[in-house]
C-alpha cells in the first residue's frame, strides 16, 4: 500500500490551527498536527484497498436461503465536511448455486468501502454492487443507519438524527415477502 504523506497533512493542520487563531506550538497542540496525520492514515486506509478481494475465496455450501449479518459497526468521513459519520450496516444475500462467503468478509467489505472520504449512499450501493458482482447471488440487500457529525455539530445541529440508506438488488427487489423477512430479522434481537 502506498503510504500517505503524513508530513504534508501535519503541515496543513498546522496552517489550519494558525488560520483559526490558535498557536500550534503551544502545549496541548504541539503534537496535534502529526496526531491528525496518523489518524487520517487510519481512517482513510480503505483508499488503497480493493474491497472486492474479500470475495476471492468462495465456499461451496448447499445453502441457498437467506444469509444476514446485521449490526456491523462502521465509521467513515463525510467527504463534504471531513467529519465522521458512524453507525451500523445490515448485509443480507440469497446465495445461488451454493456460493457463500465467509461471514467476516461481509464486515471487511463494509470496512474497506467506509474507510475513505465517502457518502453513506455510495457505501450502501458499492457494498451491494461488489457482492452482486463477486458472489453472483440471487439477490443482495444492504441497509445502513448512521449518525452524521455534519448534521450534529454544525449546520442544523440535530444530535441523534439517523440517516438510513438501502440498496436492494436481484430477488429482494421484487419479492415483498423476502424484503419483509430481512427487515423483521434486523429488528429482532
UniProtKB/Swiss-Prot annotation:
It is an enzyme of class 3 (hydrolase). Pathway: Cofactor biosynthesis; 7,8-dihydroneopterin triphosphate biosynthesis; 7,8-dihydroneopterin triphosphate from GTP: step 1/1. It catalyses: GTP + H2O = 7,8-dihydroneopterin 3'-triphosphate + formate + H(+). Keywords: GTP-binding, Hydrolase, Metal-binding, Nucleotide-binding, One-carbon metabolism, Zinc. Zn(2+) binds at residues 78, 81, 150. One of its GO terms (molecular function) is GTP cyclohydrolase I activity. Homomer. This is GTP cyclohydrolase 1. It comes from Listeria monocytogenes serotype 4a (strain HCC23). The lineage of its organism: Bacteria, Bacillati, Bacillota, Bacilli, Bacillales. The gene is folE.
Amino acid at each position: 500500500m502506498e503510504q500517505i504523506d503524513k508530513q504534508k497533512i501535519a503541515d496543513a493542520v498546522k496552517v489550519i490551527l494558525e488560520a483559526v487563531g490558535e498557536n500550534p506550538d503551544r502545549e496541548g497542540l504541539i503534537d496535534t498536527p502529526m496526531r491528525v496525520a496518523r489518524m487520517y492514515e487510519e481512517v482513510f486506509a480503505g483508499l488503497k484497498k480493493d474491497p472486492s478481494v474479500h470475495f476471492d475465496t468462495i465456499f461451496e455450501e448447499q445453502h441457498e436461503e437467506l444469509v444476514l449479518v446485521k449490526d456491523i459497526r462502521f465509521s467513515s468521513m463525510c467527504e463534504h465536511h471531513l467529519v465522521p459519520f458512524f453507525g451500523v450496516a445490515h448485509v443480507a444475500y440469497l446465495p445461488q448455486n451454493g456460493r457463500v462467503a465467509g461471514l467476516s468478509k461481509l464486515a471487511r467489505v463494509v470496512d474497506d468501502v467506509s474507510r475513505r472520504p465517502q457518502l453513506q449512499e455510495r457505501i450502501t450501493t458499492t457494498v451491494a454492487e461488489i457482492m452482486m458482482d463477486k458472489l453472483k447471488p440471487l439477490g443482495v440487500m444492504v441497509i445502513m443507519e448512521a449518525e452524521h457529525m455534519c448534521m450534529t455539530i454544525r449546520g442544523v445541529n440535530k444530535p441523534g438524527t439517523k440517516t438510513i440508506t438501502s440498496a436492494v438488488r436481484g430477488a429482494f427487489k421484487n419479492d415483498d415477502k423476502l424484503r419483509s423477512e430481512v427487515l423483521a430479522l434486523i429488528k429482532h434481537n
